[in-house]
C-alpha cells in the first residue's frame, strides 16, 4: 500500500501440519514374562519417528518512506509462533521408568514445544550532504531479534513421584532464550587512488552487537527427585529415574543469563589496477567483551588473460568466537546408544561434571582460506574451475558421549556425586 509517499507491504501465513511416522512395528517384548495374552494383543505401532505435527502463525512487514531532509527511512520485521508435538522413545510396560499404576501398557511421552521468533529493523539511508563525507552513500540501521523455545511435555510422568501428590502427566520443562541487537553505520563512495586505472570503490563502517542467552528453569515436578523407588515388578525397590520421562526439566542449577558485546570497524577497497587486473582488499577489526580483540583481512585479485579467459585468487583469515549456546547450553535427554536407552547430559564447559570429563575453556576458532581459479566464457559455453584450501584451528564441536570405561565404573554414581541425574555425558 502507498503510505506517506512510500510503501508498506504486510504478509501473513497460517500453517497446520500433520505428523509423519516411519517407525514401523516394535519387535521388542513389552510386558513381563507370564503376560503373553497382553503381549500378543499389543499394538506395536507405538513409536513416532518422523516429522512432528505443528500449528504456525507468521506475520511480516516491509516498508520504506522518503524523509523531508532527503534519503529514505525503512523498516522491516515480523513475528512467528509455532506450537509442535513430536514423540519420544516409547517406554515399555516392563521398563523401570514406567509407572505401571498410570501406564499399565507403557506410554509414549510427547514433546510439545512452543517457539516464538520476533525481529525488527529500523534504518535510514541516502547521500550525505556536508563538509565531512560529502557525497558518500550512508546506511544507518538498528536491528533486534529474539528467539524463545519453551519446552513442554505431555503424556509423561516423573517416576520418583510414584503415585504421590506430586505426580503429573504434563510438564513445563523450562525455556531457552536468545536475543541479539546490532547497530550498523556504513559508508560507500568512489575515490581516485594513484596507481589505479580508474575509480576505486571504497566502503567502511562500524558495528555494535549485543547478545543475550538465557536458560530458565521449569517447574519442580519436571526435574526433582521426590524419593519414590520402582513400585512393582521384579525390580521393585530399585532407584527410579529422576525427572520427567524423555526430557527432565531444566533445574535452577541449569539457569543461565549470559551477555556478550562486540564492537567492530571494517573497510574494503576495490578497483582496477590496470585494465586487466582487479584488486580487492578488506580489513576488519573486532573486540569482544569476553574474548578480546582480533583483526582479519582479505585480498582478492582477478586477471583478464584474454577475451573470455580470466584467472582469480584470494586469501583471507577468519575468526569465530564460541556461540553463547556452545559455552553455556545445559540439558539431559534420553538417547539410545548401542540399543540401550541412557539419560545423556550436555554440560557447559565450566561445570564440575564437564571438567571431570576433561572439558577445557573454549577458544575462538581461527581460519585461513586460500582459493585459486580460472574462468572461461564465449557465446555458447562457460566454464569455472576453482580449488580452495581452508585451515581451521580450535574447531568447536560436540565431544564424544562418555559412558563407561576410562571415566568411572559406575557412571550414574559418577554424575550423582556432581548433582547430575545422568548416565552419560558430553560437552562442546
Feature-to-residue mapping (PLM):
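Extracellular loop and loop/strand-boundary signature of outer-membrane beta-barrel proteins
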Residues: 44-49, 106-110, 166-175, 250-255, ...
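Transmembrane beta-strands of outer-membrane beta-barrel pores
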Residues: 14-18, 79-85, 128, 144-148, ...
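Outer-membrane beta-barrel transmembrane domain signature of Gram-negative proteins
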Residues: 107-121, 127-132, 144, 154-278
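Transmembrane beta-barrel wall of Gram-negative outer-membrane proteins
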Residues: 1-105, 109-127
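Outer membrane beta-barrel strand-and-loop segments of large Gram-negative receptors
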Residues: 182-184, 363, 387-428
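Hydrophobic, lipid-facing positions within transmembrane beta-strands of outer-membrane proteins
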Residues: 6, 55-61, 116-122, 179-185, ...
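Outer-membrane beta-barrel signature, preferentially recognizing the C-terminal barrel domain
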Residues: 56, 115-117, 246, 250-262, ...
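Short loop/turn motifs that connect adjacent beta-strands in outer-membrane beta-barrel proteins
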Residues: 2-6, 66-72, 127-138, 190-201, ...
Amino acid at each position: 500500500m502507498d503510505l506517506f509517499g512510500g510503501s508498506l507491504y504486510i504478509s501473513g501465513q497460517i500453517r497446520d501440519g500433520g505428523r509423519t511416522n516411519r517407525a514401523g512395528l516394535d519387535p521388542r517384548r513389552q510386558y513381563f514374562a507370564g503376560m503373553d495374552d497382553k503381549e500378543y494383543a499389543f499394538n506395536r505401532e507405538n513409536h513416532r519417528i518422523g516429522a512432528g505435527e505443528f500449528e504456525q502463525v507468521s506475520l511480516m512487514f516491509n516498508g520504506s518512506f522518503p524523509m523531508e531532509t532527503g534519503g529514505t527511512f525503512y523498516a522491516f520485521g515480523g513475528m512467528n509462533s509455532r506450537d509442535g508435538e513430536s514423540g519420544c522413545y516409547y517406554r515399555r510396560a516392563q521398563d523401570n521408568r514406567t509407572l505401571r499404576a498410570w501406564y499399565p501398557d507403557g506410554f509414549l511421552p510427547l514433546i510439545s514445544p512452543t517457539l516464538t521468533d520476533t525481529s525488527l529493523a529500523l534504518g535510514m539511508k541516502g547521500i550525505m550532504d556536508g563538509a565531512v563525507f560529502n557525497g558518500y552513500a550512508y546506511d544507518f540501521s538498528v536491528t533486534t531479534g529474539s528467539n524463545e523455545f519453551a519446552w513442554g511435555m505431555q503424556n509423561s510422568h516423573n517416576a520418583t513421584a510414584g503415585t504421590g501428590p506430586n505426580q503429573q502427566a504434563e510438564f513445563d520443562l523450562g525455556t531457552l532464550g536468545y536475543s541479539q541487537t546490532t547497530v550498523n553505520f556504513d559508508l560507500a563512495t568512489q575515490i581516485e587512488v594513484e596507481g589505479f586505472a580508474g575509480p576505486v570503490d571504497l566502503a567502511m563502517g562500524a558495528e555494535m552487537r549485543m547478545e543475550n542467552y538465557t536458560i530458565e528453569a521449569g517447574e519442580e515436578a519436571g526435574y526433582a527427585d521426590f524419593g519414590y523407588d520402582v513400585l512393582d515388578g521384579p525390580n521393585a525397590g530399585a532407584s527410579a529415574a529422576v525427572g520427567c520421562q524423555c526430557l527432565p526439566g531444566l533445574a535452577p542449577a541449569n539457569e543461565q543469563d549470559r551477555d556478550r558485546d562486540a564492537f567492530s570497524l571494517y573497510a574494503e577497497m576495490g578497483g582496477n589496477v590496470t585494465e586487466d587486473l582487479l584488486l580487492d582488499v578488506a580489513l576488519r577489526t573486532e573486540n569482544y567483551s569476553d574474548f578480546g580483540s582480533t583483526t582479519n583481512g582479505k585480498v582478492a585479485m582477478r586477471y583478464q588473460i584474454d577475451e573470455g579467459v580470466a584467472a582469480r585468487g584470494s586469501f583471507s583469515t577468519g575468526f569465530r568466537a564460541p556461540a553463547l549456546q556452545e559455552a553455556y547450553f545445559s540439558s539431559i535427554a534420553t538417547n539410545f546408544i548401542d540399543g540401550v536407552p541412557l539419560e545423556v547430559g550436555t554440560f557447559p564447559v565450566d561445570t564440575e561434571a564437564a571438567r571431570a570429563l576433561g572439558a577445557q575453556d573454549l577458544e575462538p576458532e581461527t581460519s585461513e582460506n586460500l582459493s585459486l581459479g580460472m574462468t572461461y566464457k564465449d557465446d555458447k559455453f562457460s566454464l569455472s574451475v576453482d580449488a580452495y584450501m581452508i585451515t581451521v584451528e580450535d574447531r568447536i564441536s560436540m565431544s564424544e558421549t562418555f559412558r563407561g570405561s576410562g571415566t568411572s565404573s559406575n557412571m550414574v554414581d559418577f554424575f550423582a556425586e556432581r548433582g547430575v541425574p545422568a548416565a552419560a555425558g558430553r560437552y562442546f
